[in-house]
C-alpha cells in the first residue's frame, strides 16, 4: 500500500492562514516515522519535536543546524519556505562589500502563477512607476504603524507609553515628505529620518536610555539584538509572500536592483516598524530571552495577519501599476 502524500494533500491551508513560523538553532531536522521533526540534545537524551509542515509557512535555520534531503523534500511538497541565516538574527555571510542576510530555498515542487510576475515586470523597468511602487509601500507602512502603535494591544503595555500626538506628527511629516520625493534615493532619505525618529520615540517610551541602531548584526545590547531577530522573522514572512505570488526576490522597488533579495526587504518593511520595533524595546526592558521575544513577534504577526498584509500589498501594487493589457 502506498502511503505517500501528494503535494495537493499538504497544501490545504493557504499560506496567509498558516499559523507557524520556526526559527531553529543547534538541532537536526529529519524525517522520522513519516513526520518532519527537529532533534535537540539534552545530556544523553535526544528529544524529537514535530514540525506540522502543512500549517507552517517558513522555517529559518540558524547556527548549528543540519537538515536531511528527505526533510527538504517534505518541506518542498508542503510549500514551506526555508531560510538559512546566522544566529540570533545576524547575516549568514558577511565580507567587506558583500553581505548575504538570508539564503532562501523556495519550494520547487510546483509552478508558481505568472499573473503577478507579468504585472510586476511590466512596470519595473520604468523608473517613475518603480518609484510609485516604493511610495505605495511606504504608505502601507505608515498605515500599519498608526494602526498598531495606537491600537488597543500596545496601549495595554504599561511599559510602553508615549504621546500619540508625537507619533501622529512624525508620520504626517513623513507622509508629506514622500509627496516631494522624485527618486528612490529621496525616499530612502525620508525613510532613514522617519526610522531614526521612531527608534528615539520607542526608546523614550520604555525609558531605555541612549540607543543607537547597530548595523549588520553588530549590536550587543538587548534592543539591537531583538530588533535583528524580529526583523529576520519578518524577512521569512516576506519571502513567503513573494514566493506565493511568483515574484523573484531580486525585483526590488526601493532597496536597489543590485541588492540580492531586495524585494524581501521592501516587503518586510511594511510591518517591521509597526510590529517588531515596539516589541523589541518592551522585551528588552522585561529582560526576556530570545525564545520569549520570538513568541512575542509571532503572536503579533498572527494577530495582525501580517502575511495577509504583505500579500495584499504586493497584489495591489502589481495590479494598479501593471501595464499588461487584458
Curated annotation (Swiss-Prot):
GO molecular function: DNA binding; DNA endonuclease activity; metal ion binding
Up-regulation conditions: Expressed in late exponential phase (other phases not tested); part of a large cas-CRISPR3 polycistronic operon.
Pfam families per record: Cas_Cas1 (PF01867)
Binding site for Mn(2+): 191, 255, 269
Source organism: Pectobacterium atrosepticum (strain SCRI 1043 / ATCC BAA-672)
Name of this chain's protein: CRISPR-associated endonuclease Cas1
Keywords, alphabetical: Antiviral defense, DNA-binding, Endonuclease, Hydrolase, Magnesium, Manganese, Metal-binding, Nuclease
Record text on subunit structure and interactions: Homodimer. Interacts with Cas3, in the absence of crRNA.
E.C. designation(s): 3.1.-.-
Protein family according to the UniProt entry: Belongs to the CRISPR-associated endonuclease Cas1 family.
Industrial or biotech use: If the spacer DNA has a perfect match in the chromosome then toxicity results. Suppression of the toxic effects occurs via mutations in the CRISPR/Cas machinery, or via target deletion, which might contribute to genome plasticity. This CRISPR/Cas system can be used to remove genomic islands, and possibly other genomic regions.
Protein role: CRISPR (clustered regularly interspaced short palindromic repeat), is an adaptive immune system that provides protection against mobile genetic elements (viruses, transposable elements and conjugative plasmids). CRISPR clusters contain sequences complementary to antecedent mobile elements and target invading nucleic acids. CRISPR clusters are transcribed and processed into CRISPR RNA (crRNA). Acts as a dsDNA endonuclease. Involved in the integration of spacer DNA into the CRISPR cassette.
Highest classification ranks of the organism: Bacteria, Pseudomonadati, Pseudomonadota, Gammaproteobacteria, Enterobacterales
Co-factor(s): Mg(2+); Mn(2+)
Gene Ontology biological process terms, A to Z: defense response to virus; maintenance of CRISPR repeat elements
Amino acid at each position: 500500500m502506498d502511503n505517500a502524500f501528494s503535494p495537493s494533500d499538504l497544501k490545504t491551508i493557504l499560506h496567509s492562514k498558516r499559523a507557524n513560523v520556526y526559527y531553529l538553532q543547534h538541532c537536526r531536522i529529519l524525517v522520522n516515522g513519516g513526520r518532519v521533526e527537529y532533534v535537540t540534545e539534552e545530556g544523553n537524551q535526544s528529544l524529537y519535536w514535530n514540525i506540522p509542515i502543512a500549517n507552517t509557512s517558513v522555517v529559518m535555520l540558524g547556527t548549528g543546524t543540519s537538515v536531511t534531503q528527505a526533510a527538504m523534500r517534505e518541506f518542498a511538497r508542503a510549500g514551506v519556505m526555508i531560510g538559512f541565516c546566522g544566529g540570533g538574527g545576524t547575516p549568514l555571510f558577511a565580507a567587506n562589500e558583500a553581505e548575504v542576510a538570508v539564503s532562501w530555498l523556495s519550494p520547487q515542487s510546483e509552478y508558481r502563477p505568472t499573473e503577478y510576475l507579468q504585472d510586476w515586470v511590466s512596470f519595473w523597468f520604468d523608473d517613475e512607476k518603480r518609484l510609485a511602487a516604493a511610495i505605495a509601500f511606504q504608505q502601507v507602512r505608515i498605515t500599519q504603524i498608526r494602526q498598531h502603535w495606537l491600537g488597543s494591544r500596545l496601549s495595554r503595555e504599561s511599559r510602553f507609553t508615549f504621546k500619540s500626538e508625537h507619533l501622529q506628527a512624525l508620520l504626517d511629516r513623513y507622509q508629506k515628505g514622500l509627496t516631494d520625493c522624485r527618486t528612490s534615493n529621496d525616499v530612502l532619505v525620508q525613510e532613514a529620518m522617519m526610522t531614526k525618529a521612531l527608534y528615539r520615540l520607542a526608546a523614550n517610551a520604555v525609558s531605555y536610555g541612549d540607543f543607537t541602531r547597530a548595523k549588520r548584526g553588530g549590536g550587543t545590547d538587548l534592543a539591537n539584538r531583538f530588533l535583528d531577530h524580529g526583523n529576520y522573522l519578518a524577512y521569512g514572512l516576506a519571502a513567503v509572500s513573494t514566493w506565493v505570488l511568483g515574484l523573484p526576490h531580486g525585483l526590488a522597488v526601493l532597496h536597489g536592483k543590485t541588492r540580492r533579495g531586495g524585494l524581501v526587504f521592501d516587503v518586510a518593511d511594511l510591518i517591521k516598524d509597526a510590529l517588531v520595533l515596539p516589541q523589541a524595546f518592551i522585551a528588552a526592558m522585561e529582560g526576556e530571552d530570545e525564545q520569549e521575544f520570538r513568541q512575542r513577534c509571532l503572536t503579533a504577526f498572527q494577530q495582525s495577519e501580517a502575511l495577509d498584509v504583505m500579500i495584499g500589498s504586493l497584489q495591489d501594487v502589481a495590479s494598479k501599476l501593471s501595464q499588461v493589457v487584458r
